[in-house]
Amino acid sequence: MILGLALVPSKSFQDEVNAYRKRYDNHYAQIMPHITIKPQFEIDDHDFNLIKNEVKNRISSIKPVEVHATKASNFAPISNVIYFKVAKTESLDQLFNQFNTEDFYGTAEHPFVPHFTIAQGLTSQEFEDIYGQVKLAGVDHREIIEELSLLQYSEEEDKWTIIETFTLG
């Protein structure tokens, strides 16, 4: 079973992000807009209830998270990914650090950069054109996310689905 943990924003902000993703993200149909808290990890099916309990325990002291998408940014030159940057907060860091440890399926491969991906899989020319447009349009969105979502990847459908949510705080 392949799982991941993410913060999923309100439907209205998902719609705003998806307006870009429909055009510029070749993974649009595979997963909803989200902030990755724990990248994919694999468990045995019989460990599922253990994972659910572990997630509940690890978030018991973490309050709902304020998310502020502040501007368009990118991961160039490492990869041609454009995203809405989310201001890093103590709560976001705490949530990320709870799940990116050796005792929970390993540490993160990359530093934590909270964001909502809006474009990926771009050529260099597409990247330059799209980044200029998105940067001009800008973003300034705030909301409180009260749940951490557990997602499962289906290899058959090549898609991520929320299978459980956990209330923060």
UniProtKB/Swiss-Prot annotation:
Pfam families: 2_5_RNA_ligase2. A motif (HXTX 1) lies at residues 34-37. A motif (HXTX 2) lies at residues 115-118. GO terms for molecular function: hydrolase activity, acting on ester bonds. Coiled coil: none annotated. It comes from the Bacteria. The keyword Hydrolase applies. Its EC number is 3.1.-.-. Gene3D superfamilies: Cyclic phosphodiesterase. Keywords: Hydrolase. The active site is at residues 34, 115. Belongs to the 2H phosphoesterase superfamily. YjcG family. This is Putative phosphoesterase SERP0604. It comes from Staphylococcus epidermidis (strain ATCC 35984 / DSM 28319 / BCRC 17069 / CCUG 31568 / BM 3577 / RP62A).
